[in-house]
């Protein structure tokens, strides 16, 4: 129904909309803040700005009948200008939950304030223990690995990277490990992102998609080796701002605190990065084998979500334990062994250096880099392994001088020549020169 002059809103004069007045009244009715062009309410980031556009349309549709899309776009841009705010603080002393705020000292409040992340789960200290969830985990993981998962999921509730770890859950398939991601989605809502760890490293726009996210889940990890690892390593241990790029927007600096949780049938490996730094950032848990003849419950997720308040308390318990341990995760001997296995399988130089019959570590010995590499290639031939470069073998020894009690030198004498090599190692049965 057409409005009459008597019913026109204050911001409309019959021909034009007073944008300043409209935006003031709109923000009084729908309080928001705009940070770097993105709108936030007390419930966190508004992922779909179409919702705001629809609210604007409802306000103006009684006044205007044409050119609505352009007017809505202009008013939305004006609202963002009037709602400007500097970046919201990253708060690690509290968790913003659906029914208020949980403080890390154990207290809580029903008050809500503007925040980067508001979880979609309520804090209910009287929620019962999540029995079905605990049963599910006992069927999925070894008992000694469950505390690790509990601490990591709790770690994902706070916007911090002090733990400096990413978690991999590795199985043969069909165990149900990806159910964990669905449960976390029910707790974190839009503060969780689902994408590929490969994309994070290779797509320059993908890092911006992780801004203001607590968790990124890769529920079917690509087994191909990463061509680079520098972005992933930087994000896992992020302590300062890094460069963000969005399509059509000038790059800017922002701090990421997203954590990585990956499910797959094998470990994350890299084509060229065999450094300890790459593997040190990972925790690898292996699942139990799927029992033969097990009938999967198609309603399992629904049953787990009915316990989400209890699961949240369970995660909080893990978070408090992690903080009490100075952000050092509880890692079982089996998980440590998993990591060593991954390191050896992705870097056969380690296996060669630990082998017998090719080299020997002796304090009063020396060997040229060439002789060591020839011993390594013989080991590769004998073990059907693809050899890495000579530089990679020398680098592995040089980076682990203390571990192997060797010392790099350019003073190894071979056939009257002085060449590069190592003190403290000898080649067993070297081929004649």
Question: Could you tell me what each predicted segment is?
Answer:
Residues 1-30, 40, 45-48, 125-139, ...:
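Replication-associated primase and helicase/ATPase modules
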Residues 212-215, 256-260:
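Loop/turn-to-beta-strand initiation segments
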Residues 188-190, 195-204, 226-229, 243-251, ...:
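Positively charged interface segments
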Residues 1-122, 388:
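Intein modules and their embedded homing endonuclease domains
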Residues 12-21, 185-190, 225-242, 394-395:
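A short, contiguous, amphipathic alpha-helix enriched in charged residues
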Residues 305-348:
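Phosphate-handling catalytic cores of nucleic-acid transaction enzymes
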Residues 27-52, 96-214, 283-285, 312-315, ...:
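P-loop NTPase catalytic core of nucleic-acid-dependent motor ATPases
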Residues 206-249:
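Conserved nucleotide-sensing/catalytic segment adjacent to the nucleotide-binding pocket
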């Amino acid at each position: 129904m057409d409005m009459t002059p008597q019913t026109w809103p204050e911001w409309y004069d019959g021909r034009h909309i007073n944008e300043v007045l409209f935006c003031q009244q709109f923000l009084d009715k729908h309080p928001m803040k705009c940070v770097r062009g993105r709108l936030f309410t007390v419930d966190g980031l508004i992922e779909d700005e179409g919702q705001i556009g629809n609210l604007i349309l409802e306000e103006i549709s009684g006044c205007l009948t044409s050119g609505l899309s352009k007017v809505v776009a202009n008013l939305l841009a004006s609202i963002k200008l009037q709602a400007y705010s500097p970046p919201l603080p990253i708060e690690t002393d509290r968790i913003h939950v659906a029914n208020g705020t949980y403080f890390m000292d154990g207290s809580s409040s029903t008050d809500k304030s503007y925040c980067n992340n508001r979880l979609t789960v309520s804090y209910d200290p009287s929620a019962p223990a999540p029995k079905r969830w605990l049963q599910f985990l006992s069927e999925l993981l070894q008992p000694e690995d469950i505390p690790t998962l509990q601490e990591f999921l709790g770690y994902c509730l706070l916007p911090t990277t002090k733990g400096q770890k990413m978690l991999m859950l590795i199985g043969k398939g069909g165990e149900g490990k990806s159910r964990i991601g669905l449960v976390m989605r029910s707790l974190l809502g839009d503060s969780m992102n689902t994408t590929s760890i490969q994309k994070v490293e290779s797509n320059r726009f993908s890092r911006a998609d992780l801004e203001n996210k607590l968790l990124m889940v890769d529920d079917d990890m690509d087994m191909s080796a990463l061509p680079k690892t520098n972005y992933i390593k930087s994000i896992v241990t992020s302590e300062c701002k890094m460069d963000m790029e969005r399509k059509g927007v000038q790059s800017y600096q922002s701090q990421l605190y997203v954590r990585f949780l990956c499910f797959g049938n094998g470990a994350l490996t890299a084509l060229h990065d065999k450094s300890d730094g790459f593997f040190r950032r990972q925790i690898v848990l292996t699942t139990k084998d799927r029992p033969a003849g097990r009938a999967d419950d198609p309603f399992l997720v629904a049953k787990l979500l009915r316990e989400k308040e209890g699961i949240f308390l369970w995660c909080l318990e893990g978070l408090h334990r992690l903080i009490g341990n100075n952000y050092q995760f509880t890692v079982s001997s089996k998980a440590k062994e998993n990591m060593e296995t991954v390191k050896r399988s992705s870097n056969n130089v380690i296996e060669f250096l630990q082998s017998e019959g090719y080299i020997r570590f002796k304090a009063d010995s020396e060997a040229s880099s060439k002789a060591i590499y020839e011993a390594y290639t013989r080991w590769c031939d004998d073990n059907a392994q693809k050899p890495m470069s000579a530089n990679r073998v020398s680098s592995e020894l040089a980076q682990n001088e203390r571990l192997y009690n060797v010392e790099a030198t350019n003073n190894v004498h071979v056939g009257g020549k002085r060449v590069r090599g190592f003190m403290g190692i000898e080649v067993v049965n070297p081929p004649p020169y």
